[in-house]
Every structure is written in structure tokens, then in C-alpha cells.
Amino acid sequence: HRWLNQLLASYRISHRKPNRKFKVPRAVLMQRLEIFWIVTAKLRTMVMLHFGYDPTFKNIDQSPFHQNEAGSKEWGTLALVGQHTVPLIENHAATRERWSLNTLTDSVEEQISDDNMPGFEIMFKAEGKQVEAKLQAYVLKKKILGMRVTVVTGPSGSYRENDILNFLEKHLPPWGPGRRWEIFLLDAYAPGLTDNVQRFGWLRGYLIFTHGGGASMVCQTNDTDLHQWTRKRFIDKQTALLLREARTMGGGLVEATREENIDLMIEVMQDPALHKQASKGYKYTGTNVALDGSEDWRICREAGDFWQE
């Protein structure tokens, strides 16, 4: 294909994959983003006029992981040049065994420190409650500083309405003296769109509002400024762990246990810089920029492109 490469080079044409695949037509996405920005601005204005302060934001979102995350992404491995086969040193079934990471982001960057970071929850796929009780006891024994970490199980490894309500109950502080109203964001995921979730948020002092369908990849801070870096760090740590275990075993297939994956995720998430970057995302996505337009310059990436249209 040398002639083809020379032809492409002469006309300055490159063969590339799209770096973003939207889930809805661009016109629909534009409309949903506009609705999101208008409604959040109106909610902020309402709270400011009635209570005299600008409400802060929180956002939860789940992201899928696997028992062997690097293998699930089909990352390359080392082999000798000219070798006809590539050795398999991982449990292939573990690359398909899914679990969910449910993260929480906070718009107040100044409050994030070594002693105060947004918590998270891991949901593994398991029937019954025996595995859940075992993993919860494991987490309770650990001395986790600066954040709340919980673990649950479910038949599908994905969140249902009841799971979301339980997560909110464990991770959102109750309403009381000194609390202020906050805006709580969810993506357009059916179990989170129920009246029960709305009522629970209201009782805890949160105005719950959802991103438009297909718009979370543009304006949800968990997607734009947290999960990508979390996944990269997790894969690095998990790969190093599997290599150490492979050397220790001297051969055979290696697989990270649920407990080891919990430990790795705690190591990743116990970095205030990771959460502060996610906090900056509220400005980058236009969620809580100044209402007078003085911070519009901070809106960037896809959100900035749509904001300027």
C-alpha cells in the first residue's frame, strides 16, 4: 500500500477514527444542552433571589468496569517478533465479568482536601446477599481516610431504582441546621427518573435535575473530567498487580479478586487532585459559570462549541 500512502500524503489526507460519537442527532443534542443550561440558570436564580446564595452542584454517575479491565479493552501484550501465537496469561472470562463504579462529583473545589473527598460505591454482579455481606465487612475493616466508600451487589451489576435510593441515603447528608439547598444532577437513566428519587432528594435539600438523553457526554462532569482518568489509573495499577501475581505463580492464568479491585479503586480515588479536576469540569461544561457572562470564556471542548452556536 505504499502508493496509497504516498497519494494520501501528497494531498495531506490522514486516515483517522472519529474521536467522538454522539448518541443523538446534533440538532437534538443542541436543543437538550440549551434546555440544560437554561434550567440550571433558572434554578440558581430562584435560589439566589429567595435565599440569597448561589447553590452548589453535585452529580452522580455509574461507569462500567471489569474484573480484568485492561483485558476488556484489548490492550496489547509483549511477544517475540515472528511468534505465530500470542500467549494468554489472563483469565479471559474476567474480561467479561462486569461491575459498576458509581462516582460523586462536587462543584466546590475549595472544600476538597485529603480529609474531605467525594465518596464512591462499587456494585459487583452477584445473586443473594452473602457476597455483599462479605465485601461490606471487608471494606469496614479498612481505614479509609477522607471519603466514604461503600460496596453492594446486584443480579446484573447495574443500578436499579432501589440501589440509587440506597446510594443517596448513604452518601448524601440529611437536611439540618447549616445546610443549604444544592442542585443534584443525574443522567437520563430510567431508574433515576422516578418520583421516589425526586422526593428523596427534596427531603435531603437537593433539587434533582437530569441531563438530556445523550447529552451527559458533553456536560456531565463525571464523564468529561473524572471517569477517563480514573479508568487509566486503575488499569495501570491493575496491570501491575496482575504482572506481579503472574511472576509469583510462575505460570498459569491470573485474575484480580473483588477485594483486590476494591483496594485498587480506593488507591486511585484517594487523590484530591482527581476530584478537584472533576470540580473544575462544572465550569468547563458551563454548568455553574457566572450568570453575568463573565466566565463564559471558561466553557470549552464540545460544550464550548455548542455554547457558541
Regions found by a protein language model. Give the residues of each.
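Phosphate-facing sequence motifs and polybasic nucleic-acid/acidic-lipid-binding regions
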Residues: 1-308
